Amino acid sequence: MNLKNIHTIYFVGIGGIGMSAIARYFATNGKLVAGYDKTPSQITSGLEELGIEIHFEDSLKNIPISFLDKDKTLVVYTPAIAKNHTELNYFLDNNFIVLKRAEVLGKITESTFCMAVAGTHGKTTTSSILGHILQPVNATSFLGGIAENYNSNLILGEDKVSVVEADEFDRSFLQLSPNIACVTSMDADHLDIYGEAAALEESFVEFANKVSDTLIVAKGLPLKGLTYAVNELADYKA
């Protein structure tokens, strides 16, 4: 699927921090965007200011007619959406192109020089700093939080270089193809998804193996790469 040929994009769970960054990206690149979320928020208000139509009731009657043409519409959803969600199941049952958020992020960044930041802690701060540093060279950054100096979770640049906050939830980061990646930490988290810490660690190892160029890791993590530390001997230290 070539995203350049998709002109209408509907988000199920558009108010999520990761979903809203992608919605901003498409809207500011001239795509027609709309979506559903459970409750209004500052994030959904910001999206509406961009001209994105959002509703807060799970009902087919609320889907704008422009998004009911399955040959022209991409549907993006978050794994946090309930399996019995009426709108999502309508799109699935009627053979729309339906992709998870992580799959779409992977497709957006696959043709860029991608720098991904993963870790159970520290990835939002690190990716925000990296995105800010690379803003003068027109990198596009997808963040997992609102950067105060940009008032956004998207730093929009060109499509040559990207910075991505790589989320381990639901193994989402395995949809990325990073050239350079950083892993800040690997604590036992999301065990409702992974079941045990060993499975989480295996997922990080799989992510590390997808890096085509350079992997940078906090010292002490069970991954092979350049190391960094504070007041300890490492490849890079402060």
Task: Give a label for each model feature.
Residues 1-54, 70-75, 91-96, 128, ...:
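ATP-dependent carboxylate-amine ligase
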Residues 25-28, 48, 61-67, 72, ...:
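Phosphate-binding loop of NTP-binding sites
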